[in-house]
Each structure stands twice: as C-alpha cells, then as structure tokens.
C-alpha cells in the first residue's frame, strides 16, 4: 500500500503543472479523455480481479510485447491530438498491462505514438492516466487488507517515492533511445520462456 502512495506522490511531483491545471479547471477536454481512458482499464482490471485470473505464465510474453512496442514506436513521428478513439485504445492497452512483464507506461506511450500522437504529449498523457490506476489499486488494497500506518510504512513510502522519481526520469530518457532496453527485455523474455518450457528454475 505504501508503494501506491509513494508512486502517486512521485507522479504528482513530476506532473505537478499538468495536475494542478486539471484541479483548477476539472471540467475540460483533458479530464474527459482521462476518464475515457480509465473506463476500459477499469473493466479489464475488474474482470481479472473478480475472476481471480492467474496471468503469471505470461511473463515472458509480456516482456516480448513491451520490447516490440518500444522498438516499433521508437522512430515514429506524430502531430495528432488525443481523440476519443485514441483515448479508448490507450485505455485498452493500459488495461492489458495487468499482464506480468507488460510495462504500463511503456505500452501506453508506445501505443500513443503508434496512433500518431507526438512524443511529449504521449509521455505526459501516460503519466496522467496512471493517477486513476494508482488510486484504484490503493483503494482495492485498502478494502482487502485495511489501512494501517507505522514508522516502517513511512520509511517504505520515502524509499519508494525517491525510487519512483528516478524511474520516471529513466522512462523519459528511455524513449530517446530505447534500443538497449529492448535488448534487455528481449533477453528477459527468452530467459523466462526457456525456463518455463524446460528448466522450471524460477
């Protein structure tokens, strides 16, 4: 639970201008698009949660799909704005990121660029639509296990917050040159797949 709080705080710090603008003017096109994106995400998450679907066997596939999306979208140029249709497709992509190994931010940013949305808008939008996801995950965990606070939780929050900020900076640099990360993900995918098929070591 502390991870959700820290991740949300990191996103708020990184996207403070955009989030404050939405708080000041909540009734706007951007809010509507974020809600549209959240809809298919919530539906997929609810199906997986209530049906207790085990997706652990898809870890290798998740790594491979993330690598392919990053590679395919790396050199794409776009000038389009986010439309109703693209918001829903991004939401579907975000929902499918419940699959282990499939990066939520990597897949949503890549899909945005595939849809013709320019790089900076894609990154900003991906971080903004993560806010409802993080809040939803926090509430789900709180309803399941209750909410408690301790000094250990505070220390965990602080550690996760700074780790989250570093991860956000890494993601921003990643999309300048994702090829090294693509090689890393492809190697992970091959390792996990070989393990699942032959070795069963982990």
Model regions: which residues?
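Multi-pass membrane proteins that catalyze or facilitate reactions on polyprenyl-/lipid-phosphate substrates
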Residues: 1-100, 104-202
